[in-house]
Regions:
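Hydrophobic anchor residue at the start of the ABC signature
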Residues: 133
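Conserved ABC transporter NBD signature motif
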Residues: 53-67
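The feature captures the beta-strand-to-loop junction immediately N-terminal to the Walker
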Residues: 34-36
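Conserved ABC ATPase "signature" region
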Residues: 88, 92, 98-115
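Conserved structural motif at the start of ABC-family nucleotide-binding domains
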Residues: 3, 18-20
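Helix-to-loop junction immediately C-terminal to a conserved catalytic motif
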Residues: 49
Length: 142
């Protein structure tokens, strides 16, 4: 098991955005959170990644620090840098691999390999999100 949530609840003032959320995430699985705007998906993801604390309940992480990644709605890329240069910058800043082979593999995993030398400022919003996902993949999640 990678992550276990038990009885998670989150209050913002008197407003409950999460109530009694419990589930487990296992290595090699894909977990999808679906809900309406304001349902608490982002709050739950932040709690799972350790970026926020639940009001009640427990979160158990069975991975090393950095084993979970979080990609929010709005992320930043340097528009004047290529996809490879963006990955090298962010990866190096966090002490992760910066060799071209590793960075190219991350781009391939998010189907951006053909755009490795393209300036990120020319990317569509979806491509920019995939570039940010490649950044998270370089953190070597379990």
């Amino acid at each position: 098991m990678l992550l276990k949530l038990a009885g998670i609840g989150k209050l913002f003032g008197a407003r409950a955005v999460l109530r009694n959320v419990s589930f487990e995430v296992h290595p090699g699985t894909v977990t999808l959170l679906v809900g309406a705007n304001g349902a608490g998906k982002t709050t739950l993801l932040k709690i799972m990644a350790g970026l926020a604390r639940p009001t009640v309940g427990t979160v158990e992480r069975f991975c090393e620090d950095g084993g979970l990644g979080y990609l929010g709605h709005a992320t930043f890329i340097y528009p004047g840098l290529t996809a490879l240069e963006n990955l090298a910058f962010w990866s190096g800043m966090h002490g992760n691999p910066t060799d071209k082979a590793t960075l190219s593999e991350a781009l391939a995993r998010v189907e951006l390999a053909p755009f490795a030398e393209e300036r990120a400022g020319t990317f569509s919003r979806g491509m920019a999100q995939r570039l940010n996902l490649a950044r998270i993949l370089l953190q070597s999640p379990p």
